[in-house]
Amino acid sequence: MAALTADRVSVRYPGQAQPALDGVSLNVGPGELAVALGPSGCGKTTLLNLFAGFQFPDSGSVRFGGVPVAGPGAERAVVFQQHALLPWLSALDNVAFGLRLRGVPRAERRELAGRALAQVDLAEAGARYPWQLSGGQKQRVGIARALAGRAGALLMDEPFGALDAFTREQMQELLLKVWAESGSSVFLITHDIEEALFLATELVLMSPGPGRIVKTLRPPFSRRWRAGDSARAIKSDPEFIALREQLLADVFAQRKQEAWA
């Protein structure tokens, strides 16, 4: 698997006093699950858009596997907060849709789509339509669609933000399972501190005005889940709680500085 790198990238939007990103560097190594945590306006969505090739930096560079990112590509799959499923297609056909656009033969794409649905525990739901699926199931289909293309990197834009707390935790555990099985690099953005700590092998805390990385951590908790600890046990662990409170204090300190700036 290849590394996803941003090297001293800066982005300024027209009419904004501060850059959305100011000299940000981040390396998402092969097989890593990197999470960008921060409040609205910190530049985390802009950073994801750069990795996806949806936009380009004003300065600095973005590469995947050492090759400059020149636009969207099948090797970098994006999972959005809203599922974006086509309502007239079944779950299986939604998963296979991107493969169809790439000219993959019908039998092969249906096999790949079926395998991807099985990876997200929806093997029996291929014939269902989006209106027959719960919110969590729709997001599973979105993840399966990314997996079916055998992308080397998954880019996830607050994928569980619209889900209830119970379903969100289920989806977090599913993501760790899929990540472990696929070996893909994952870059996920969130404003949820607990989610970031639980999922990340590398966590970067970002601050707004201008968007910068102000803290980097390597939490052990996703590795512990892979070793057999439950999500509930991990999230009630004193080490987890202490790190959560420290990050919360960091975010509040940023907000206080902004108020006095």
Curated annotation (Swiss-Prot):
GO terms for molecular function: ABC-type taurine transporter transporter activity; ATP binding; ATP hydrolysis activity. Signal peptide: none annotated. Residues 4-233 form the ABC transporter domain. It is an enzyme of class 7 (translocase). It comes from Chromobacterium violaceum (strain ATCC 12472 / DSM 30191 / JCM 1249 / CCUG 213 / NBRC 12614 / NCIMB 9131 / NCTC 9757 / MK). This is Taurine import ATP-binding protein TauB. Part of the ABC transporter complex TauABC involved in taurine import. Responsible for energy coupling to the transport system. It is a peripheral membrane protein. The keyword Cell membrane applies. Keywords: ATP-binding, Cell inner membrane, Cell membrane, Membrane, Nucleotide-binding, Translocase, Transport.
